[in-house]
From Swiss-Prot:
This is Large ribosomal subunit protein uL6. Belongs to the universal ribosomal protein uL6 family. The lineage of its organism: Bacteria, Bacillati, Cyanobacteriota, Cyanophyceae, Oscillatoriophycideae. One of its GO terms (cellular component) is cytosolic large ribosomal subunit. Part of the 50S ribosomal subunit. Signal peptide: none annotated. One of its GO terms (biological process) is cytoplasmic translation. It comes from the Bacteria. This protein binds to the 23S rRNA, and is important in its secondary structure. It is located near the subunit interface in the base of the L7/L12 stalk, and near the tRNA binding site of the peptidyltransferase center. Keywords: Ribonucleoprotein, Ribosomal protein, RNA-binding, rRNA-binding. Gene3D superfamilies: Ribosomal protein L6, alpha-beta domain.
Length: 179
C-alpha cells in the first residue's frame, strides 16, 4: 500500500497540465517540464487535482505508484515555485565566483575548477563562500549541487571543503603524537 501514491496533487492557479497516455507536460510561470512516466501507472486529472492510479496490485506497480506521484508533484512545484540548493565553502583561501552560467571554484587545487551549468539552472555566489543553485527541475538541481560538492567534499579532520547548507560533518580526532 503506497500512502504517498494515494495523496492527490493540487494544481495551483497559473499551472496547466497536459496528459497524453504516459507522457505528462506541466507548464507554469517559471517554465515547462515534460516527463514520460513508467508503465503500470496512470495519471488522472479532474478540477484542479491530479491523482496517480496504479493499474494492478503487482509488486512493480506498487513500487512505481509512490515514485510517479512524487515525480509529478515535483514537476508541479518546480514550475510554480522552483527549487534551490545552497552550498557553503569552508577553508582558508577557498572561494567561488559565478559569471553567467559558469562557476569557478578555488578550493585548494593548483588551478581553479571551472564548471558549466546546464540550461535552466541558475547559479549565484554570495560573500564568495555561499553558492545558491536554482532551477525548476528538482533532479537536475540536486545533481548539479552534488557535482559541485564532489569537487572538494568536507574532510573530517579540519572540516574544510564544500558542504550543503546545514550539513553536519562528523569530525575525527587527530592522531596523538607520542612524547
Amino acid at each position: 500500500m503506497s500512502r504517498i501514491g494515494k495523496r492527490p496533487i493540487t494544481i495551483p492557479n497559473k499551472v496547466t497540465v497536459n496528459i497524453d497516455g504516459s507522457h505528462v507536460a506541466v507548464k507554469g510561470p517559471k517554465g515547462e517540464l515534460q516527463r514520460t512516466l513508467p508503465t503500470l501507472v496512470i495519471v488522472e486529472q479532474d478540477e484542479g487535482v491530479l491523482r496517480v492510479v496504479r493499474q494492478d496490485d503487482s509488486r512493480t506497480a506498487r513500487q512505481r505508484h509512490g515514485l510517479c506521484r512524487t515525480l509529478v508533484s515535483n514537476m508541479v512545484e518546480g514550475v510554480s515555485k522552483g527549487f534551490e540548493k545552497r552550498l557553503e565553502i569552508q577553508g582558508v583561501g577557498y572561494r567561488a565566483a559565478a559569471q553567467g552560467s559558469k562557476l569557478t571554484l578555488n578550493v585548494g587545487y593548483s588551478k581553479p575548477v571551472e564548471m558549466d551549468m546546464p540550461s535552466g539552472i541558475g547559479v549565484a555566489v554570495e560573500k564568495n563562500t555561499e553558492i545558491t543553485i536554482t532551477g525548476i527541475d528538482k533532479e537536475i538541481v540536486g545533481n548539479v549541487a552534488a557535482k559541485i560538492r564532489a569537487v572538494r567534499p568536507p574532510e573530517p579532520y579540519k572540516g574544510k571543503g564544500i558542504r550543503y547548507k546545514g550539513e553536519v560533518v562528523r569530525r575525527k580526532a587527530g592522531k596523538t603524537g607520542k612524547k
